[in-house]
Amino acid sequence: MAMARTKKGPLLGVVDYTLAKRAVLRDFRRGLLSRLDICDAHPELMRAARYVGEEISRGCPVCAESRLRVLAYVFADELKRDNGRVWTVDQGAALAARCRDAKCYVVEVCTGCSWNHLSEVFVGRDAV
């Protein structure tokens, strides 16, 4: 994930979803959302997180028992057969930088409790 954020040049725009994540977690801690509401990762997302996702240093904000894993889904017409595939974040950001209409969706997942949230989206700058 560091590569995508620190690389210089007109590669990617970034949409960060940290505030949305904070709002969900705040509502969970206040009792407005249940654990079932927020720990709802699809089985395919859980599988992708286990086998493709990269473990990061942050722990899960819900269960605090597992470290989060991040993975990327990249969508672009230019990608043809690779459109919508799961990638590591660095691979996904590199693909998005190569394709002008690409969007790289970065998702954080806890494989312990099924918490998942869209973390950020990298957008090819020509697509903005």
Task: Indicate residue ranges for each PLM-predicted region.
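Generic structural motif recognizing short loop/turn segments at the entrances and edges of beta-strands
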Residues: K8-V15, A64-L71, R100-K103, S114-N116
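Short, compact, well-ordered microdomains
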Residues: A96-V128
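Short recognition patches in nucleic-acid-associated and regulatory proteins
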Residues: S57-G59, A64-R100
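Short Cys/His-rich Zn2+-coordinating modules
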Residues: R35-R50, T88-A96
